[in-house]
Amino acid sequence: MKIVFMGTPDFAVPSLKSLINEFGVEAVFTQPDRPKGRGKKLGMSPVKEVALEHNIPVYQPLRLKNEPETIEELKNMEPDFIIVVAFGQILPKEVLDIPKYGCINLHASLLPKFRGAAPLNWSIIKGEKVTGNTTMLMDVGLDTGDMLLKDEVEITDNMTAGELHDILMERGGELLVRTIKGILNNEITPEKQNEEETCYAPMLNKEIAKIDWSLSAQDIHNLVRGLNPWPVALTSYDDITMKVHQTRVEKGESNKEPGTIIAVDKTGIKVSTGKDILVIEKLQFPNSKQLFVEQFINGNTIEVGKVLK
């Protein structure tokens, strides 16, 4: 059986390793090397590193859909499966039609919820209690293909996007192996997505990171968790941009304008919101490292009564 793998970041690495160990992988497609670090030296993707360690041929098309010679090489491989995990490119129909059993994508949400580029972040931002991975047969739409298998994961009250990323990353490979075996054994019936249940998870940017203090403390807490470790929720203290890395929710009302700092102690900075109180536990000012409030107030002052914007 021939498997071609397409993926790029850390998230795709455990999936690639699982496929190598279980079935073997014929070829790997990944994004071109990019400048990294302060020296801007070209660095290879995490997926490329693993492929080279296992002596697997690597292809790095700038845009696969615009490279007919590369597509022809892919056709000549006659793959049974093309497995796609965070590749970072849209596959044209010409590629989707190549493998015997189709192109299978691992998507980090319980489809049809949270189609798009940042599903695990938006699952937390929107306050979901359960998410997971879905394997699906790819079509020309954006995460619209028929679903194959799902693996559910609980989102705990203080789980961050970084923590959820690592859980889904590690569990993705096992789900892909089960999916491939299920297809080969005729044990899986593809299921169409219910369009009425869809919602989208657009790419993250710094615009959505600005905290709206008129929201409830729970909604802000979800935003903080969903944007940790990147791009990190932001607010302004005396026109200074402050990153908010960790928070908790306290029940109760302050009757103060949303954003008003109502108390400061070593356990955190208590801030009035549209509903309940948000306690900032870890923060970061410009040109400084992130600190717990207990550390921060040793050398800095946060004034009660100031309004965060």
From Swiss-Prot:
Attaches a formyl group to the free amino group of methionyl-tRNA(fMet). The formyl group appears to play a dual role in the initiator identity of N-formylmethionyl-tRNA by promoting its recognition by IF2 and preventing the misappropriation of this tRNA by the elongation apparatus. It comes from the Bacteria. It catalyses: L-methionyl-tRNA(fMet) + (6R)-10-formyltetrahydrofolate = N-formyl-L-methionyl-tRNA(fMet) + (6S)-5,6,7,8-tetrahydrofolate + H(+). It is an enzyme of class 2 (transferase). NCBIfam families: fmt. This is Methionyl-tRNA formyltransferase. Pfam families: Formyl_trans_C, Formyl_trans_N. (6S)-5,6,7,8-tetrahydrofolate binds at S109, L110, L111, P112. One of its GO terms (cellular component) is cytosol. Belongs to the Fmt family. The gene is fmt. HAMAP family: Formyl_trans. Keywords: Protein biosynthesis, Transferase. CDD domains: FMT_core_Met-tRNA-FMT_N, Met_tRNA_FMT_C. Its EC number is 2.1.2.9. One of its GO terms (molecular function) is methionyl-tRNA formyltransferase activity.
